[in-house]
Amino acid sequence: MNKKIIYIDMDGVLADFDGTVDQLFRENPGKFRENTKIVDGKAYRSNSSIPGIFGMLKPVAGALDAVNKLSQNYDLFVLSSLPWGNATAAQEKVLWLKRYFGEDENSVFYKRIIFSSRKDLAIGDYLIDDRPTNGAEKFPGKVLRFGGEEFPDWRAVLDFFEREI
């Protein structure tokens, strides 16, 4: 029997984009001000243009353990969009995945990374994503809105998939 496929977004799901950017701005306001859109003291997603930003991200709490648990019963793939204004984003994201999940052929995401701004074109059973953009809102399988009311964290996601088995 084939395992069901889960696509996992990176920014805001595996990697803590907003939290890391907020911390970097608080610690170094002069360094990031030029590349930052600030509204009421909070850094927003335009920060994806900061060179090297994706390599600085910390994992979302619980993400690493959850991925390892899910990989036992599901085929996992990263499905992430790339910012048009950051030419190094793809390389930084691949290096981030290697750092946290390993580089060898036994790594859970070895040759399982897809970059696309059309997530609705992916064929699979589940998509874990924090935003309804880049085609996520039209994904043909079940979408788990990470950080939302039903799936606020990785514990809630794991609970859902434990019921699905």
Can you say where each PLM-predicted feature lies in the sequence?
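Conserved Lys-Pro-Asp/Glu-containing loop-to-beta segment of HAD-superfamily phosphomonoesterases
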Residues: 5, 108-135
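Active-site neighborhood of HAD-like aspartate-dependent phosphohydrolases
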Residues: 1-51, 142, 150-152
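Short catalytic/ligand-binding loop motif for oxyanion handling, primarily in non-cytosolic enzymes
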Residues: 15-17, 23, 78, 85-89, ...
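Active-site donor-binding segments of glycosyltransferases and PAPS-dependent sulfotransferases
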Residues: 87-119
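Acidic, Mg2+-coordinating phosphoryl-transfer loop and its flanking beta/alpha structural elements
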Residues: 126-159
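Substrate-recognition element of Asp-dependent hydrolases with the DxDx(T/V) motif
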Residues: 58, 63-91, 97
